[in-house]
């Protein structure tokens, strides 16, 4: 009888521990393998890339979309923030915080505009800040864009409003309610701030609601 009871108790404990194991298995980091490097070389990892391959990490995570579906996501970032991002995405996953899409920007030929238009969340991409000759923090894998279509980059110049991506104009008015919107104080904002990231929505001369970066 004791053996039977012990068996069922063991099964019960295993079942209770299963969600944590699944959660742990769904969130991993690794060095950039040859297969991944072949995928990004000449795209996000351009020929003039100054960030060493050894400084980058490939992340695999789980995330929900607004319809409650669980999706597999992937992202490349700098090794110094890999653990931070895994912790952040684990917490977002536990809370069922919606992220529509998370694929390597290379699936869009490293075209930031195309990736944003598809509402693709991403990190590493060796490129310049839009409209400047300065390298973006994305070039080092030290910045992350979350749900970029619904959280656009907005700049006002000479009476004109510049919005990126170009199809994000309906989401410039942050008083409106719509899915995937990041607002100051929400879970996504709080988690990134907890791990020392700065939010583009706090900028004064422009707003980049999708953007979190770390120094």
Description of each model-found segment:
Residues 1-21:
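Bacterial Sec-dependent N-terminal signal peptides
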Residues 21-69:
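N-terminal module-boundary/linker segments of secreted carbohydrate-active enzymes
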Residues 51-116:
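Active-site acidic/histidine clusters and adjacent loop/turn architecture
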Residues 52-55, 135-141, 191:
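Extracellular/periplasmic catalytic domains that process cell-envelope and extracellular macromolecules
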Residues 64, 84-98, 127, 149-152, ...:
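Structured segments of extracytoplasmic/periplasmic soluble domains
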Residues 70-79, 132, 173-180:
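Second-shell loop/turn segments in exported
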Residues 99-100, 114-148:
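Mid-length scaffold segments of soluble, non-membrane domains
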């Amino acid at each position: 009888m004791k053996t039977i009871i012990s068996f069922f108790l063991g099964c019960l404990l295993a079942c209770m521990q299963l969600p944590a194991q699944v959660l742990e298995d769904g969130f991993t980091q690794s060095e950039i393998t040859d297969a991944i490097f072949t995928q990004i070389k000449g795209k996000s990892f351009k020929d003039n890339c100054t960030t060493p391959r050894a400084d980058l990490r490939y992340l695999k995570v789980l995330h929900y979309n607004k319809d409650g579906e669980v999706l597999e996501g992937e992202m490349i970032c700098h090794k110094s923030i890999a653990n931070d991002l895994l912790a952040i995405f684990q917490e977002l996953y536990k809370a069922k915080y919606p992220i529509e899409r998370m694929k390597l920007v290379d699936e869009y030929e490293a075209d930031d505009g195309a990736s944003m238009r598809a509402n693709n969340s991403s990190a590493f991409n060796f490129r310049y800040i839009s409209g400047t000759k300065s390298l973006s923090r994305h070039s080092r894998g030290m910045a992350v864009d979350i749900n970029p279509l619904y959280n656009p980059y907005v700049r006002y110049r000479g009476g004109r409003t510049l919005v990126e991506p170009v199809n994000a104009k309906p989401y410039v008015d942050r008083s409106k309610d719509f899915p995937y919107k990041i607002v100051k104080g929400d879970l996504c904002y709080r988690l990134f701030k907890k791990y020392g990231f700065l939010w583009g929505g706090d900028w004064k001369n422009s707003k980049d609601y999708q953007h979190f970066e770390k120094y």
